[in-house]
A protein has these predicted regions:
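Sec-dependent signal peptide recognition
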Residues: 2-8
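C-terminal motif of bacterial Sec signal peptides marking the signal peptidase cleavage site
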Residues: 13-17
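Metal-centered catalytic cores of metalloenzymes
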Residues: 18-98, 102-178
Length: 178
């Protein structure tokens, strides 16, 4: 073969190999996750207070230039009242935390990302005198290692909300990719 032909073939093989090596390890663009949450999924089981609590959580994860992600959470819950009590009582439910945990369904997990509920005066606990919650949190920073782990195995993570009446957890649900 002529040297020019060998050079062209070598460059072609080299560039084909480079495409595979340079392929991104994580998906680009917004990734949507969701969770159907209920008290029956909480471990250990949620108490009889707020037993009817259920709802859904939608999560949109957007890549940032640093390899990290920002996430937006939309949370809708209902049934957050003391069982057998009129919903408008002042001692209705108070959501004190929303947390993403790493853990399998039916098992206790480790907290990996906490929403800013009740942590500052700007984001107080969510009072629910009517027994419902609809709230959105935007631009929640998700470190790159955590984002990669969640995107690789969403069902290995769950979302759980905690209330003043059920500090160990009022609703929980595993994350799933949409």
């Amino acid at each position: 073969m002529k040297p020019l032909t060998l050079l062209v073939l070598a460059l072609g093989l080299f560039s084909a190999g480079c495409d595979e090596v340079l392929a991104p390890a994580t998906p680009s663009g917004v990734v949507s996750l969701a969770s159907q949450v209920s008290g029956s999924q909480v471990v250990p089981a949620a108490g009889s207070l707020e037993a009817g609590a259920a709802g859904g959580v939608s999560v949109s994860m957007t890549p940032a230039s640093s390899g990290a992600y920002t996430a937006s959470f939309t949370i809708q819950l209902g049934g957050l009242v003391k069982a057998g009590v009129t919903p408008l009582l002042p001692d209705g439910s108070v959501i004190v935390a929303g947390v993403v945990y790493q853990g399998a369904a039916g098992a206790l997990g480790s907290p990996v990302l906490q929403l800013p509920i009740g942590q500052t005066a700007a984001v107080p606990p969510l009072y629910t005198p009517t027994g419902t919650v609809l709230v959105t949190f935007s631009n929640v920073a998700v470190p790159s290692a955590l984002a990669s782990a969640i995107l690789a195995n969403p069902s290995g993570f769950y979302f759980q909300m905690h209330s003043a009446l059920n500090a160990a957890g009022v609703v929980r649900g595993q994350l799933v990719r949409q």
